[in-house]
Amino acid sequence: MPSDASTGYVDDQPGDEAYKRGALYKQTKARRADYDSDKEAKRPCTEDSDVALAGTSEEKEARLPKRKVAVMVGYCGTGYHGMQYNPPNRTIEAELFEAFVKAGAISRANSTDLKKNGFMRAARTDKGVHAGGNVISLKLIIEDPAIKDKINEHLPPGIRVWGISRVNKAFDCRKLCGSRWYEYLLPTYSFIGPKPNTYLARTIEQCGEAASEKPDRDQESLDFWEAFRKAVDEKFTQEEQDAIVNYVAPSKEDFDENSGLYQKVKQYKQMENAHRRSYRVSSAKLARFREAMKQYLGPHNFHNYTLGKDFKDPSTVRFMKDITVSDPFVIGEMKTEWVSIKIHGQSFMLHQIRKMISMATLVARCNCSPERIAQSYGPQKINIPKAPALGLLLESPVYEGYNKRLLEFGYEPIDFRNYQKEMDTFKMVHIYDKIYKEEVDENVFNAFFNYIDAFNQVTGAQGEPTKSHDPAKIQLSIIDFLLPCSSSPQENASPEAQKAPETPAGDNTISAEQPKTATEVPTTQSDA
């Protein structure tokens, strides 16, 4: 076709050189390069081509079917950022997934994404929380009869697979879990009343003088602290005691570990710690705690036992099926006495168990009526502190209802009782012993309750309710709730007591969801 101006037609298509300089050419060239590269990678090499082809054929023949299974696991949560897969953080699921791949239970093609395998957990545990038993459901290659042992070979000692059971394709371990058992280990010295002259001790004393709603006199705790006072009087002069009480740690640059005053303070704390660990709970004190825990049985509105939930939110109603508190037992070189609390509930909200334990323990510490707990289910907002995560562990999910359907389908039921002996041994070595040791090394529970005993700041709104301010939305501190006779604790406290105490040693982190207040106390462990 003519392209000169005389014809009235101008060729608007670029020439070869102009085309090669354009963006479209560069993009097309890049695509061709990618195509050629892929084609080259797929083409068997000319040398040893028979081996390459044979290898490809063998890989296709070795491809095995995936089966939907329930994997029963146990783990120690220390050192992990919880159960749920959350890269780049180190989690339990990340360890399990890697072990599945290394053992051949998950193919390399499916080793990059949990979703490809239908990964789901029955109960998500938070940072530092352990599980004697938990269940995950996913698709695995289980043709190898020794697959469980191979998986365990690739797992650290603190994570174990108890069993692998075939389930039907519709199985969802979280949705079909009928209920869950949790256990909480608590040192009995947590039940001792607050140390004399702390804010909480003065508040209880003030309530004891009130005409109504006063707590019972806690003679057991008074005798305990009187015995400690006598031991201190024998060890230190009054001048030394005053210096110890008023001791303020110097800056790191000025700190002298060999100073006489610091050594006195250290001796005093060691005496107090040893005296506390020698405590043995009385039957009356333990009975009060057991009665407090019984208040949780049945369906209740637990909106005060979690975060961000309103009284009218229907999801806050939870059903507790059974609660047991063991007899006291003594563990470890320090001869600390403990109790085990087991809670069986249909489901639990964030922090719920730790707040339940905290409330019941404070009932015992304040020696007030266990029936106060029943009033926490009402619309009044209460700021309940979380007990340390250290003592919490998931005992096991329960599939009582769904196990009947599994039997009908010809599958084995999901029952942790088949592995109870192995689980008990594992818990003693990898969970219980670590809990006991960490409590002794860090004084976790002592730091937590000392912080509450000393902190007097009322959280939430203060002042008289107005027409535009619902009194139920005025957030009470846990102390104001348990001891309503202390109507104005700030007015009755000394100037020194009104100062917020220092955070327990070893904890300087405050999460966004847990403000540093009198009742949301930072602990040395994270949530459960």
Curated annotation (Swiss-Prot):
Residues 486-495, 506-528 have a biased composition (Polar residues). GO terms for cellular component: nucleus. It is an enzyme of class 5 (isomerase). Residues 1-59, 486-528 are annotated as: Disordered. Residues 31-46 have a biased composition (Basic and acidic residues). It holds the Pfam family PseudoU_synth_1. It catalyses: a uridine in tRNA = a pseudouridine in tRNA; uridine in snRNA = pseudouridine in snRNA; a uridine in mRNA = a pseudouridine in mRNA. Keywords: Isomerase, Metal-binding, mRNA processing, Nucleus, tRNA processing, Zinc. Its EC number is 5.4.99.-. GO terms for biological process: mRNA processing; mRNA pseudouridine synthesis; snRNA pseudouridine synthesis; tRNA pseudouridine synthesis. The active site is at 126 (nucleophile). Its cofactor is Zn(2+). It is found in: Nucleus. InterPro entries: PsdUridine_synth_cat_dom_sf, PsdUridine_synth_TruA, PsdUridine_synth_TruA_a/b_dom, PsdUridine_synth_TruA_C, PUS1/PUS2-like, TruA/RsuA/RluB/E/F_N. The keyword Acyltransferase does not apply. Its main location: nucleus. Formation of pseudouridine at positions 27 and 28 in the anticodon stem and loop of transfer RNAs; at positions 34 and 36 of intron-containing precursor tRNA(Ile) and at position 35 in the intron-containing tRNA(Tyr). Catalyzes pseudouridylation at position 44 in U2 snRNA. Also catalyzes pseudouridylation of mRNAs. Belongs to the tRNA pseudouridine synthase TruA family. This is tRNA pseudouridine synthase 1. It comes from Eremothecium gossypii (strain ATCC 10895 / CBS 109.51 / FGSC 9923 / NRRL Y-1056). The lineage of its organism: Eukaryota, Fungi, Dikarya, Ascomycota, Saccharomycotina. The gene is PUS1.
